[in-house]
Amino acid sequence: MTHDPYYETMYILRPDIPEEEVESHLTKYRDMLVEAGAEVLDNQMRGKRRLAYPIAKHKEGIYVQLSHNGDGQHVAVLEKAMRLSEDVIRYLTVKQEGPLPAPRVMPGSEAAQQQQAEAAASAD
């Protein structure tokens, strides 16, 4: 069984932007892809993490992962918008082959707590 290729874009936002603005970035880039004719498969906020090395004098960043598929033309539109944004300090888009992996849950998040509660309920 063959699977269509898809794209994964990981981008890092400045750590000092407010939570509402982070949500607006998630929505903005998702909507931009849809307008360009792509299908958004997954949009996950990975949270604030320490960077391996300082980027633009920042030691931390807010990581966001965006999985999408389309004809590839939408990637240029997305990356141009990210390049022009002062809030995005780094981005990378990679073409993936194979099936889309199951979404991972960040430990300590509401989704992780909900998974633990469901697992405990099914164990009883």
Swiss-Prot record:
<dbReference type="GO" id="GO:0003735">
    <property type="term" value="F:structural constituent of ribosome"/>
</dbReference>
<feature type="region of interest" description="Disordered">
    <location>
        <begin position="99"/>
        <end position="124"/>
    </location>
</feature>
<keyword id="KW-0689">Ribosomal protein</keyword>
<keyword id="KW-0694">RNA-binding</keyword>
<dbReference type="InterPro" id="IPR014717">
    <property type="entry name" value="Transl_elong_EF1B/ribsomal_bS6"/>
</dbReference>
<protein>
    <recommendedName>
        <fullName>Small ribosomal subunit protein bS6</fullName>
    </recommendedName>
</protein>
<keyword id="KW-0687">Ribonucleoprotein</keyword>
<dbReference type="InterPro" id="IPR035980">
    <property type="entry name" value="Ribosomal_bS6_sf"/>
</dbReference>
<dbReference type="GO" id="GO:0006412">
    <property type="term" value="P:translation"/>
</dbReference>
<comment type="function">
    <text>Binds together with bS18 to 16S ribosomal RNA.</text>
</comment>
<dbReference type="GO" id="GO:0070181">
    <property type="term" value="F:small ribosomal subunit rRNA binding"/>
</dbReference>
<comment type="similarity">
    <text>Belongs to the bacterial ribosomal protein bS6 family.</text>
</comment>
<dbReference type="InterPro" id="IPR020815">
    <property type="entry name" value="Ribosomal_bS6_CS"/>
</dbReference>
<dbReference type="GO" id="GO:0005737">
    <property type="term" value="C:cytoplasm"/>
</dbReference>
<dbReference type="GO" id="GO:1990904">
    <property type="term" value="C:ribonucleoprotein complex"/>
</dbReference>
<dbReference type="Pfam" id="PF01250">
    <property type="entry name" value="Ribosomal_S6"/>
</dbReference>
<feature type="compositionally biased region" description="Low complexity">
    <location>
        <begin position="109"/>
        <end position="124"/>
    </location>
</feature>
<keyword id="KW-0699">rRNA-binding</keyword>
<dbReference type="InterPro" id="IPR000529">
    <property type="entry name" value="Ribosomal_bS6"/>
</dbReference>
<dbReference type="InterPro" id="IPR020814">
    <property type="entry name" value="Ribosomal_S6_plastid/chlpt"/>
</dbReference>
<dbReference type="GO" id="GO:0005840">
    <property type="term" value="C:ribosome"/>
</dbReference>
